[in-house]
Amino acid sequence: MEIIYLRDEFIKLGQALKAAGFVESGVEAKEVVQEAKVLVNGEVDTRRGRKLYEGDVVSFENQTIEIKKL
């Protein structure tokens, strides 16, 4: 499980996927999100710009990101 620590109030889904190293680019993030391959808190979300807050959990290809505050 990867942990991303927030410096601000939120991080966008596409940015979180890139920060965790799950995708290499914003274009790739957009594709996997639009193809419904990403779960946020156990539900499919196709919005690359979805705001993630402390406590949110993102899953992609058997990998997980947990969002925490610094």
Predicted regions and their residues:
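A positively charged, amphipathic N-terminal helix/segment that binds anionic biomolecules
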Residues: 2, 57-70
